UniProtKB/Swiss-Prot annotation:
Heptamer of 7 subunits arranged in a ring. Interacts with the chaperonin GroEL. HAMAP family: CH10 (MF_00580). This is Co-chaperonin GroES. The gene is groES. Pfam families: Cpn10.
Length: 95
């Protein structure tokens, strides 16, 4: 199964953070913060305006982005965890 978002939605692969502290303590899954950075892996075609014209999305596949802690819906595609959200839920692109 592959996944293609519709309209103004994007699919993001979260960038996982280190699972150990600097002191060597392993952080259990239940105590981990939800990652708020990720890489765009798929984008929709955009939304239609009042004239019926498609307004394309600004984000592109491969962009590294910063998003809200509770943004989007988590899904699993081919065993890979993804987050689907609207482009407007993204705060910005990380250079």
């Amino acid at each position: 199964m592959s996944f293609k978002p519709l309209y103004d939605r994007i699919a993001i692969k979260p960038i996982e953070h280190e699972e150990k502290t600097k002191g060597g303590i392993i952080i259990p899954d239940t105590a981990k913060e939800k990652p708020m950075q990720g890489e765009v892996v798929a984008v929709g075609k955009g939304v239609r305006n009042e004239k019926g014209e498609v307004h394309p999305l600004e984000l592109k596949v491969g962009d590294k982005v910063l998003y809200g802690k509770w943004a989007g819906t988590e899904i699993k595609v081919k065993g890979e965890d993804l987050i689907v959200m609207k482009e407007s839920d993204v705060f910005g692109i990380i250079n």
